């Protein structure tokens, strides 16, 4: 993550006007204040807990890039709508492989309140494995495929981690606890979830450099 900060583009005048998921994503994808595109708060399927509706007329970054000849992909978490016209493939992404909803109740089953929100484009899927590792693997495969076909492409990779639940692979928790046995279990799990995420980002970066 530090390497991305040091070598990438720093948006040092970017404000999402919110500390939560949906508005931040709306701001990132449109370059506008989230409330101006209908997302002042978290988008949820239940009316009494919903705080937004992504304006279908808002122009998104992948739409602009797509018009410029880029292939566009979202791998990972969407959280800007559950139904048409606010599905990833309808908002500028040629390829979607990931999670539609707000959070996972389990990083291995990928369920949210009993529902399955894992999709490959418009098809529900039920992959096996930790979500962070799945998103990494799918991203690596996507980069290699587009590079092989010599397509200019844009990949928006959005992990669920380190969002709760604090569910890193056990071996990563063990590493943290071996370094500092005084850590509370919850703290150790959070550190492990972040380190596991960082490790997986580190698997994507070399592939992108190699194939650009």
Each language-model region and where it sits:
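Formylglycine-dependent sulfatase
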Residues: 1-212
């Amino acid at each position: 993550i530090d390497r991305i900060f040091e070598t990438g583009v720093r948006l040092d005048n970017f404000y999402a006007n919110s500390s939560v998921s949906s508005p931040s994503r709306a701001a990132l994808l449109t370059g506008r204040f989230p409330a101006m595109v209908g997302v002042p708060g978290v988008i949820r399927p239940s009316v009494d807990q919903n705080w937004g509706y992504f304006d279908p007329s808002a122009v998104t970054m992948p739409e602009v890039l797509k018009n410029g000849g880029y292939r566009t992909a979202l791998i990972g978490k969407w959280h800007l709508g559950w139904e048409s016209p606010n599905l990833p493939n309808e908002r500028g992404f040629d390829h979607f492989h990931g999670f539609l909803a707000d959070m996972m109740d389990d990083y291995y089953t990928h369920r949210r309140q009993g529902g399955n929100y894992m999709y490959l484009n418009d098809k529900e899927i039920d992959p096996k494995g930790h979500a962070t590792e799945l998103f990494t693997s799918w991203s690596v495969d996507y980069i290699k495929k587009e590079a092989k076909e010599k397509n200019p492409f844009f990949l928006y990779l959005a992990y669920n981690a380190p969002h709760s639940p604090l569910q890193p692979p056990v071996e990563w928790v063990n590493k943290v606890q071996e370094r500092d046995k005084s850590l509370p279990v919850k703290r150790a799990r959070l550190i492990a979830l972040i380190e596991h995420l960082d490790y997986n980002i580190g698997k994507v970066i070399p592939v992108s450099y190699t194939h650009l």
